[in-house]
Amino acid sequence: MDRPRFKRILLKLSGEVLMGQGQFGIDPETVARVAREIADVATHYELCLVVGGGNIFRGLAAAAKGFDRTSADYMGMLATVMNALAVQNALEQIGVDTRVQSAIPMSTVCEPFIRRRAERHLEKGRIVIFAAGTGNPYFTTDSAAALRAAEMGCDALFKGTSVDGVYNADPKKDPTAIRYETVTFNRVLADDLKVMDASAVALCRDNNIPIVVFNIREQGNLARVLAGSGTATTVQN
């Protein structure tokens, strides 16, 4: 299926993508590769990013082990700021003008999230990286990605992960699992397909923002998926 071309997109990167082959933290070579993938398409689109923090700290997992949930979630938000700065650094090293905006104000390291300012950055050809989730506990970075995509008027939300789309079962556990080319938001919610958390999916559904799930670990795949030729799943109404 040929996916339509878009003008403004939001790219959600899971924190785990930045680990490379490691089990924790940030792998500079992987971040540099991802930055090159982004730079290759940045001249054709107005591009925003949301980066997860799971490679450094997972609030939900920490809460399950006894951390106060609110404190754990704030720690997870701070982890996303570290990742955002790492991606910004990698992009600017290859000449891509970038701004980081945080939902939690920290003026010494990045801008606060101001939608109108973010709009101006995009209009000037800069990439805007949104950090610190929504700024509120109990919300995932998937929800933050959906929220920012809606606020910024993005035409689509691209989720770059370590899998090549959405399956009707876990392909790592079930060899007969089938990958969807397209699937509706309502099917994702009804069947509890693991695309994003339910609040993020519902927000995209209600604002008619398609979600494209693809494997960003595969070199060159971001450009192929944006062109409509890569392997991915599109979630839409």
Curated annotation (Swiss-Prot):
Entry EC number(s): 2.7.4.22
Residues reported in the UniProt entry to bind UMP: 53, 73, 134-141
Residues reported to bind ATP: 12-15, 54, 58, 161, 167, 170
Domain of life assignment: Bacteria
Catalytic function, reaction form: UMP + ATP = UDP + ADP
Pfam families in the record: AA_kinase (PF00696)
One Gene Ontology cellular component: cytosol
Gene Ontology biological process terms in this record: 'de novo' CTP biosynthetic process; UDP biosynthetic process
Molecular function (Gene Ontology), one example: UMP kinase activity
Principal location: cytoplasm
Compartmental location: Cytoplasm
Keywords recorded for this protein, A-Z: ATP-binding, Cytoplasm, Kinase, Nucleotide-binding, Pyrimidine biosynthesis, Transferase
Transmembrane segments: none
Record text on activity regulation: Inhibited by UTP.
Leading EC class: transferase
Pathway assigned in UniProt: Pyrimidine metabolism; CTP biosynthesis via de novo pathway; UDP from UMP (UMPK route): step 1/1
Disulfide-bonded cysteines: none
Stated family: Belongs to the UMP kinase family.
Subunit text: Homohexamer.
Function: Catalyzes the reversible phosphorylation of UMP to UDP.
Protein name in the entry: Uridylate kinase
Organism: Rhizorhabdus wittichii (strain DSM 6014 / CCUG 31198 / JCM 15750 / NBRC 105917 / EY 4224 / RW1) (Sphingomonas wittichii)
Gene that produces this protein: pyrH
